[in-house]
Regions:
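Core AdoMet radical
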Residues: 67, 71-75, 79, 83-173, ...
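Generic structural signal for well-ordered alpha-helices
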Residues: 76-80, 106-110, 132, 171-174, ...
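Auxiliary Fe-S-binding modules of radical SAM enzymes
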Residues: 1-37, 84, 116, 208-300
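Catalytic cores of alpha/beta
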Residues: 128-137, 193-208, 252-265
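Short, small-residue-enriched loops and turns at beta-alpha junctions
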Residues: 67-70, 97-102, 191-196, 221-226, ...
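N-terminal [4Fe-4S]-dependent radical SAM core
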Residues: 21, 26-81, 85-91
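Mobile, glycine- and charge-enriched loop segments
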Residues: 50, 54-72, 107-122, 171-191, ...
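Conserved C-terminal portion of the radical SAM core fold
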Residues: 93, 142, 168-246, 273-274
Length: 300
């Protein structure tokens, strides 16, 4: 890459940090750059932006995926109690595929979380505004959607959706979640087969329309270059300075680097299924080694 182009890209980064806005072509140019200096400058700018708007605190939240298990009231309540005892004040529950959220079970779980003053986030793949309002009234704090993308063609391919109505209704629901007073967490992936940096740029620019409280960015598969995810995280931070950004989940053992690199790229939240005090202490140690503090529940 010519020096003139590097200087231009640095100007883009300065513009993003100052005005929190970029044009689509500028985002594409930054994503396409293979110069490590550009990644470094992006992460530095995103880190400054995070500290300016969200200070140094990193939030630890509990994440539990039921997978194919059918959740029951007693088991879920034990999980909530275990998370509370570990120090978590927010818990994300991801339901199994096809599970029905219109049952009294989930309203019961939401009520139990509210009684314990824990914030419950439900991860959904199908949205219905009536159900969302009912669950919100039961005590659900927010909703999480792993859309993957906001491009209808790509969405229908990765979710095997046969009708455009599903996609249109999903966007309508997401755009209205904020109005019902619930938090909205949006997840999208980079490196989806058949996509380009132009598609990623479009997803990044679409985010403000959904007014999310939290954004999760991940690689579509382990084979996708982590650099692309780091750049995307940094750009979302620069263009959306007030949003919270979640790093890759820590699901069992500590990963070698990803979530720490993502914190340095602008993420401020770590989701984990780890509840052992010794492992939580290790996660907190690494977060502090990056120059951040941890939410006070884990400073006891």
């Amino acid at each position: 890459m010519k020096m003139k182009n590097i200087i231009t890209l640095r100007d883009y980064i300065q513009q993003a940090e100052k005005s929190h806005s970029l044009e689509r072509k500028q985002i594409i140019d930054l994503l396409d750059s293979n110069n490590p200096e550009i990644l470094h400058q992006l992460c530095l700018a995103a880190g400054r932006c995070r500290r300016r708007w969200l200070f140094h605190e990193t939030q630890l939240v509990c994440f539990f995926d039921f997978g194919e298990e059918a959740p029951d009231a007693d088991g879920t309540e034990r999980l909530i109690l275990k998370a509370e005892n570990a120090g978590f004040s927010k818990i994300i529950l991801k339901r199994k595929q096809g599970d029905d959220f219109q049952t009294a079970l989930w309203q019961h779980i939401a009520n139990r979380c509210r009684q314990r003053r824990m914030q419950l986030i439900l991860s959904l793949d199908k949205f219905n505004l009536t159900d969302i309002n009912r669950l919100k009234d039961s005590g659900v704090y927010g909703f999480r959607c792993e859309a993957g993308t906001f491009n209808e063609r790509i969405y229908r391919r990765i979710h095997k959706s046969k009708t455009s109505g599903n996609f249109s209704y999903l966007l309508k629901c997401l755009e209205n979640i904020h109005d019902c007073g619930a938090d909205l967490t949006i997840g999208f992936a980079v490196g989806i087969p058949g996509t380009t940096t132009s598609d990623i740029a479009s997803d990044i620019l679409y985010l403000p329309q959904l007014r999310p409280h939290n954004v999760e960015i991940c690689r579509f598969s382990p084979e996708v270059d982590e650099t692309l995810a780091l750049k995307s995280i940094a750009l979302v931070r620069l263009l959306n300075p007030r949003v919270t950004l979640t790093a890759s989940p820590v699901l069992c053992n500590l990963p070698e680097a990803p979530f720490l690199e993502q914190l340095l790229a602008g993420a401020d939240t770590v989701a984990t299924s780890v509840m052992l005090p010794s492992m939580l202490s290790e996660i907190c140690f690494h977060i502090k080694a990056c120059g951040f503090t941890v939410n006070r529940d884990f400073e006891k």
